[in-house]
Structures are given as C-alpha cells and as structure tokens.
C-alpha cells in the first residue's frame, strides 16, 4: 500500500516540476513550487523509516509552510503591482 502512495506522490511531484517549467505566470509557478515542496516533505517522511527521518520531515514541512506563506505574500504583492 505504501508503494502506491509513494508512486502517487512522486507522480504529483514530477507533474508540478514540469508545470513549473512550462508555466508563464510567475504567480502560478510559485503555487506549483509550493505544492512540490509539500510533496518532497511527504516523500522524506515515507522513505526514511526512523525517528530521525520523522524529525527531518517535520523540519522540512515547517520550512515549506514558511515558504508557502512567503509565496502567498509575494502573490498578493504582485497583484498590487499589476
């Protein structure tokens, strides 16, 4: 069952990577980047099967959340500029 979950998350990560390079809108690129970072934190938690892996996944997730807040702020600022 975990293999299917890892494959699905990996597919989503690859899809977001492709969309980052194909998208022209900077705001959408930032949203896809945010989704990609959450996929990476999920894959870290699933692959590293130890307490240290959990700590790394939690740390990466917290940093991803902070970066997603920065992304949301940047998108809001670009709306004011445009």
From Swiss-Prot:
Entries under Pfam families matching the protein: DUF2109
The organism's place on the tree of life at top rank: Archaea
InterPro entries, per the entry: DUF2109_membrane (IPR019214), Prd_NiFe_hyd_3_EhaC (IPR011316)
Family: To M.thermoautotrophicum MTH386.
Record-given protein name: Uncharacterized protein MJ0526.1
Gene source species: Methanocaldococcus jannaschii (strain ATCC 43067 / DSM 2661 / JAL-1 / JCM 10045 / NBRC 100440) (Methanococcus jannaschii)
């Amino acid at each position: 069952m975990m293999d299917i979950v890892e494959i699905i998350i990996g597919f989503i990560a690859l899809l977001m990577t492709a969309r980052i390079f194909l998208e022209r809108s900077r705001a959408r690129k930032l949203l896809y980047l945010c989704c990609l970072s959450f996929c990476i934190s999920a894959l870290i938690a699933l692959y590293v099967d130890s307490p240290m892996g959990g700590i790394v996944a939690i740390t990466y997730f917290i940093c991803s959340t902070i970066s997603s807040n920065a992304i949301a702020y940047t998108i809001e600022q670009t709306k004011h500029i445009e």
